[in-house]
Amino acid sequence: MGIRGFLIGTASAMALLTGAAHAQTSDTTTAPDDGEIVVTGFRASLAQSIDAKRKADSIIDSVSAEDVGKFPNTNVAEALTLVPGVTVDRQFGQGEKVSILGTDPALNRTLLNGQTVASADWFILDSPGRTFNYALLAPQLVNRVDVYKSPEARIDEGSIGGTVNVLTRKPLELKPFVVAGSLGYLYNDRSEKGDVQGAALVSWHNDAGTFGLLASFQRAKDRLRRDGLESYGTITADFWAGKNDAGTSSITTGNCTAACATTLTANPGAKFPNAFGTSYFAQDRERLTYSATAQWKPVEELTITADWLRIDATYDNLNQSMYAFPGNVWNSAGSLTGLTVDNGVVTKASFRNALSVLDAQYRVAEMHSQTFHGQIGWNDVNWDLNIEGGVSDADGGTKKQVFLEFLNWADYTVDISGAPDKPGTLSYGSNVLGNPAAFATDPGWSGNLVNKPTIDKERYGQVDLGLKFDGSLKRWSFGYKYRHHETGQSYAGIALTGLSVPAGNFDTSPVKDNYLSGFDGINDQMAGRFIINGDSMVNYVQGRPNLPTPSMFAAAEFTAGNWNIKEDIQALYSQINFEQGALRGNIGARYVHTKTESAGFVCRPGAACNAQADWIWQTTTRSYDNVLPSVNVAIALQKDLTFRFAASQVIARPNYADMSNYFWLSDQIGTGGGGNPDLKPYESTNYNASLEWYFAPRAILAAEVFYKDIGNYILQKTAREQYFNQFVGAVTTYNISRPFNAGSAKVKGFAIAYQQSLPLGFGVLANYTYADGKGEDGADLPYNSRHQASLSPFFESGPVALRATYTWRSKYFTGIDRGDQMYVRDSANVDVSATYNITKEIGLTLSGMNLTDSQYYAYANTQRLPRGVYKNGRKLLATVNVNF
């Protein structure tokens, strides 16, 4: 790694306190020293963001509570879309993962009041990781969000891209008595359903300002439907010519003669979707958030704070995928009748008597998180002391999955020749997609019952001491922090067998008329498919006599999916803040000792992995030490021009799932993957510099450059390995994906930001970021969009406020799936909001989110091989806000 430079910090304590005060009083008019009257409302809150950035020692961007309230969003991630260098992933229609300066979301940290909060995901295919799920955080909690693009020694380590610190409201920072609330209705035009939203906050403190209480509650419910086209892995054309592991063709060449046979012989490596069809995903998301804060200030220097936060969220969902499956070995009776290949891709293939599948999965998914935090702060003239501690627990995942699989054999054609604009067409000789009687379960394997819960726990304590000085040395701070983190998942299931029942027995119905609206190239068969009733399916399965109980030893994939990670972290730091004339900044270092314990089930070598005795619980322990120096310098070149430079050495620990002993195999398609407990942390030398021109009141034009030299970069690698295949009953070859420290990577780029409040109530925010991230041999880095841009014009005058937000990001790599390089195509998003303040205390807001119903297009290797193409619908939100 590079030199041990010294890195940068963030906003000074005075700047942060000033920003907090302004954020809480943005509805009042203020007069700065030069006598200019500052506008109120949203324009004032933007001015506070500029002010916080200007006064900071480090490269930082802030979003105030007024910003969050004005954005047409459902979570905090959406409010960060206008921060230069920040991109958001919206697979399910709203921001859930945040990338900073071209780095993987797992390489960024999100803190709540400077601390890690336990959280969990709901999706059955997700594993516990370090990525924070922003969908869990209610915007009403937020006072301010600070995005640190360069670290300070005093701030928790673990981020290469940047650190997001979410600061919540405190009663002693508000007016003596505050009552605020909102009541609204959120409607999704794709699901054609809506529900009531509500939030309330009450804050009080005594006249002396020595004791205060705050309590808040929020209910958010989103009834979404995601329509899509999906494929599951890729196969090569020689799969149909007897080149698979069994030595026989999954589908016989059949009537593939003449030109078809010639094409097949000449293009053995041409790729084609292993399976392709339509997806129907329906979900009711409900999040209940409760919070309370008490503050006591018995003397001027001492402040004691206690915080409580609880989140209860449900994500029950019904997923129904209906697809042709030409790559399945059950197709021995099928035949290939036609084939078209273009530039290494099978663009069209026709089959006779080949397999189709309807997978119906009803999942009970939920997340609960509870955090207790205590803080004692003493702030004297010459010194200050901070003592903090807390406990944060979360559980989530899929508590129950009921899965039935229905099979059909028919003649069909899969045509992806129009991709990416026309992702694909599935055509049948007879319309089985609209015929529930044509699909039935197979008694040999009819489905399964699965539960896959997860846990996440955090324990922490810290002590910080600061000494204040006159002269160039302003403050010397040092401290100690201890963190204990535990995360893991359980995985149990049981196969359902002996069922022979048609799909028509489960209260089927045609999809709504708007199903797959906005997808080019689909046909009436796809748009008119049927769906089953989830409750009917669940009642049928759970009503079966002698229903087996899910077990972690029922199959290898379940056993291998049980793992646990424990992590103990101790940190010491020292930091000096300095100021001399036009020069200011900080210099410091952080020493960190990390000890990890990775445990999970591993199959004994040579065993069939189909009995409890074949498995052992294996624990791997490792530890490492890091010294992380940092320096930050800010120079006021002139009154309205500031130059900043930062250098640092940072680490990011491996994702929890990557560190585990987790291992899985898919016997039918010959793929698998798992974790690697011997992974080393990412290590990076970072350089940042910026030039900020405050050319007018409430205006900024800024340019920023960044360079990250990352070592021990972790990437998924795929290798061919042999394991016992329970489906085949013999040892076969699998494509196995595992994480490895693949070597080095570099991320470099620049960002340009412009913000200005214009005359007559108008204003604009705009930014562009270029981030070029490459690993060894030019490998793409996960979630690195080379280009990102956003534009947000606004108008605010009197009781009226209008705003539009446009964001765009270029394509990005997401990882390896079943041996394929996975990408997401470039996408754009448009949101608008309009507010009318009926009185000073009461306002009405209308918001439109995802107005273009943007398409999420994931693909394998090339855009001509779609993997998942989705639309989540537009959202309309009407809200009445009160604030007294």
List where the protein language model places each region.
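N-terminal periplasmic "start-of-domain" segments of outer-membrane beta-barrel proteins
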Residues: 38-71, 97, 105-108, 120-122
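Outer-membrane beta-barrel signature, preferentially recognizing the C-terminal barrel domain
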Residues: 354-369, 557, 561-568, 622, ...
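Repeated loop/turn-to-beta-strand initiation elements of outer-membrane beta-barrel proteins
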Residues: 210-211, 301-304, 382-385, 473-476, ...
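C-terminal beta-signal and adjacent terminal beta-strands/loops
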Residues: 711, 808-815, 835-884
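Extracytoplasmic beta-strand/coil segments of soluble accessory domains associated
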Residues: 77-120, 149
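Gram-negative outer-membrane beta-barrel transporters
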Residues: 707-709, 719-721, 725-817, 852, ...
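Solvent-exposed loop segments that connect transmembrane elements
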Residues: 227-278, 318-360, 405-447, 498-512, ...
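Outer-membrane beta-barrel translocator/receptor signature
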Residues: 124-131, 140-147, 154-256, 260, ...
